[in-house]
Amino acid sequence: DGKPWDSYPTEQIARDLRFFKYEPGAKWHGFEDYGPDQYFVDPCKFLLTTPGINIERGEYEPFGVPAGILAEYLRENGIVPEKADLNSILFLMTPAEDLAKMENLVNRIAHFERLLDANAPLSEVLPVLYRNHAERYRDYTIRDLCQELHDYYREYDLKSIQKAMFRKDELPRRAMLPQAANYELVRGNCELIPLSEARGRIALEGALPYPPGVITCVPGEVWEGVVLDYFLALEEGVNRLPGFTPELQGVYIEKDPDGRRRIYGYVLTRERARELGLRMGFGRGIPD
């Protein structure tokens, strides 16, 4: 109708499905390759986006508030979000929610915004995080932390890598079936190596980073391309900003003797790959 979404009364929004449609080409969501009336916003999911990305241009702004920082603040104040991505945070609405809980959530977010505007000391905003990593974040303010984490996202362009991981032409090559890869893992035909040394090697476990919470390298696929780049970028973040380690499944964070934390994964041994005659296609063999 040409009017802002929030100018309509709540009662009308609740009854009219138009308010929940993903319109193809709309700038606010950035999704592509779907048709009219194909997808709708789930009214039971309360999704907030945090500052840091220009929605119209899809580019990083000079300053941002990574959702993980807001999520940490809420957890330290007794509110557990369902999920926090790079610049979005999700809450699930259930029949158990009441007005008091919603008001508490809104009040906490508003208080966080006031602390951000005042550039309060990090020790006051996130006392648990600060206590656990006092040496790393000594004398930091909340905006200092937001800026550093935002700059890391921007340096590695994590939003673009995350999006590219699920494009068909960026998916890892499959060298063997997932079941066959699992058999090789169970039989011990594997080695645990840093992902920084895994390019071209065959994964034997499915690797799932959270965010986005989806398996990105299936057993039997080759560690390569943007999927490997994403995990290596996460590894850099683990070392730069302690306290914001993402949840990872199928790969393992280990501390090296030099103190650096690295992400490791199980891969098929080169000897076993050659025994199976795996050349991994596209004219490229098992790397030496």
Q: Regions from the language model: what does each represent?
A:
Residues 1-288:
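Non-catalytic terminal extensions of PLP-dependent enzymes
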